[in-house]
UniProtKB/Swiss-Prot annotation:
Pro-piece positions: 16-41, 57-68
Name of the protein this chain belongs to: Riparin-1.5 amide
Organism: Crinia riparia (Streambank froglet)
Positions bearing Cysteine amide: 53
Residues in the signal sequence: 1-15
Length: 68
C-alpha cells in the first residue's frame, strides 16, 4: 500500500515539473498563463486560491504576540 502512495506522489511531482517546464518554454503569453494557472490550481494549498495564506500567518503571529 505504501508503494502505491509513493508512486502516486512521484507521478504528481513529475507532472508538476512538466507543467513548469512547459510554462517556461512557451513563447505565447496565453500558453504561459494557462500552464501557470494549472500549476496554481493543482499544486498550491487551498488557502492560496482564497488568498488567505498571508492572513493566516498574520493572525497566528498576532496570537503568539498576544499570548506572551
Amino acid at each position: 500500500m505504501k508503494i502505491i502512495v509513493v508512486l502516486a506522489v512521484l507521478m504528481l511531482v513529475s507532472a508538476q515539473v512538466c507543467l513548469v517546464s512547459a510554462a517556461e518554454m512557451g513563447h505565447s503569453s496565453d500558453n504561459e498563463l494557462s500552464s501557470r494557472d494549472l500549476v496554481k490550481r493543482f499544486f498550491l494549498p487551498p488557502c492560496a486560491h482564497k488568498g488567505t495564506c498571508g492572513k493566516r500567518s498574520i493572525e497566528s503571529s498576532e496570537g503568539a504576540n498576544g499570548g506572551e
